[in-house]
């Protein structure tokens, strides 16, 4: 006969009696409620810190875009993210970090090549000034950026095309979420394919792989786009 499943210490100690299935059910409900409260608290803290960070940098007059899982969820698939990514110009990175420090964030100059970090109420803000592949916040990306609403806060985020290129380039095995974020945007956004091709040149081989895979899963990617990008990588 198989041994019965172990029970928690709390269940075993209820008035010295043998635990019943109802005890375990009650504990499960309690645990679920606790997790839900924690999730609600985390979401509230995230929204509050996001607002504080965005409004502080806006008041200081620096140009930036919200990047990462939050940005992609506003044009693609809903996805919870635990941190905030701000894409800034390299020359502004230290100043933006100082703005957040003045606003009550703890800060660190994490890596002088591409990222600084700020923290408040267990929420991390990544101040990114160079994306893998040598992508920077430039005038063209800013001019193509769009506004979306998040919890009553207007956020400026990269265009769907720029997000696809960025996600396709930064994708690695341990960060597969970027790949699936890009696929969701490909499947849901009305894209300017010529602009996407133009921006994809910085990482054409990776973006080509993404588009071929997307087309193989019946996401509508025009064959001429794949053909043009193939020529960019391998020649005519």
Where are each of the predicted segments found?
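Compositionally biased terminal segments of proteins
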Residues: 2-236
């Amino acid at each position: 006969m198989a041994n019965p499943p172990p029970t928690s210490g709390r269940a075993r100690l209820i008035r010295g009696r043998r635990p019943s299935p109802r005890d375990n059910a009650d504990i499960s409900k309690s645990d679920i409620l606790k997790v839900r409260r924690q999730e609600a608290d985390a979401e509230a803290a995230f929204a509050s810190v996001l607002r504080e960070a965005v409004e502080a940098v806006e008041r200081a007059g620096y140009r930036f875009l919200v990047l990462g899982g939050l940005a992609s969820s506003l044009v693609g698939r809903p996805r919870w993210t635990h941190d905030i990514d701000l894409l800034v110009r390299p020359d502004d990175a230290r100043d933006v970090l100082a703005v957040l420090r003045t606003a009550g964030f703890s800060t660190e100059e994490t890596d002088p090549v591409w990222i600084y970090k700020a923290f408040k109420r267990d929420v991390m803000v990544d101040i990114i000034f160079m994306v893998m592949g040598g992508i920077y916040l430039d005038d063209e990306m800013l001019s193509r950026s769009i506004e979306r609403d998040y919890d009553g806060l207007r956020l400026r985020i990269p265009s769907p095309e720029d997000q696809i290129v960025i996600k396709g380039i930064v994708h690695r095995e341990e960060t597969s979420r970027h790949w699936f974020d890009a696929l969701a945007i490909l499947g849901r956004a009305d894209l300017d394919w010529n602009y996407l091709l133009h921006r994809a040149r910085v990482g054409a081989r990776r973006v080509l792989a993404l588009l071929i895979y997307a087309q193989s899963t019946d996401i509508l990617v025009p064959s001429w786009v794949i053909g043009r990008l193939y020529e960019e990588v391998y020649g005519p």
